Amino acid sequence: MGCIKSKQDCTVHKTIQLTRNQEKDEMHNKELVGLVQANQEDSKLCSCSASPLLLEYAHRLSEDIVNKAVRQWAEVDSKYSDIPYIESDAI
């Protein structure tokens, strides 16, 4: 049998997640402003290599995407974790 989860714990958890998401969105917006300013300066130089700022931003963005995907998987998994998995030998 699955365990019963407290509704209060879920609301606290969701509140914490919303706060974290808002903080990340604010940081993301600040990074975009810095990136646009850096790109304007770099366009004057016309260098062929990627700027370290751009590479760092891409790395952080990819980590953020993976973190969101894992969080989404965990939320879906927690919704359905109390439903038992039934294996069937029938084809």
From Swiss-Prot:
The molecular function terms in GO held by this entry are: protein kinase A regulatory subunit binding
Matching entries from PANTHER family are given as: SMALL MEMBRANE A-KINASE ANCHOR PROTEIN
One GO CC term of this entry?
A: plasma membrane
Q: Which UniProt keywords apply?
A: Cell membrane, Lipoprotein, Membrane, Myristate, Palmitate
Q: Which family does it belong to?
A: Belongs to the small membrane AKAP family.
Cell compartments where the protein resides = Cell membrane
Q: What does this protein do?
A: Binds to type I regulatory subunits of protein kinase A and may anchor/target them to the plasma membrane.
Q: Does the keyword Membrane apply?
A: yes
Summarize the PTM comment. Answer: May be palmitoylated at Cys-3.
The name under which this protein is listed is Small membrane A-kinase anchor protein
Give lipid-anchored residues (N-myristoyl glycine). Answer: G2
Question: According to its UniProt record, what is one Pfam family this protein matches?
Answer: SmAKAP
Question: What broad class describes the main subcellular location of this protein?
Answer: membrane
Cross-referenced InterPro entries: Small_membr_AKAP (IPR027969)
Q: Does the keyword Lipoprotein apply?
A: yes
